[in-house]
Amino acid sequence: IEALFTRIAKGKGMPHINPVVDLGNAVSLKYTLPMGAHDLKDVTEGISVRMSRAGDTFLPFGGTEEEILEDGEVVYAAGSQIRTRRWTWRQSQHGEIEPETSYVFFPIDGFTDFNKAEVLAARDELEQKLKDVFGCETLVGFLDAEHPEMVWE
């Protein structure tokens, strides 16, 4: 979110990645919430928010070399594959949105005691626009300390 606001403040406007990611960026800016977008084509086990563990590695977006994570960093994981580190701040090359992407996960970061209402409003608006504009089928969830994982079939 910081990079988007900085880009706009410098007069560079919104970046165009693809229409679905652009929509996510617009919702992210509207609600001032960090949000990512991940291709789920290789994900079969669901997504979880957890602390990194010994042996976890991370392939940075645009990178070619895996980084070894220290224990205790907040990550989004698909099984043992780390999709983001430092919440949604650093996205992995795994899950890059491509023109043929058809299954997308949009993590929206927030805090239950601080901005839960905004997170839920952003989630609901994004879902409705994905349906109305793109004709998408959607599945939504809300992950927190009591519900750290989302599984689908």
Where on the chain are the PLM-derived regions?
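Non-transmembrane, aqueous-exposed alpha-helical and coiled segments at domain scale
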Residues: 1-153
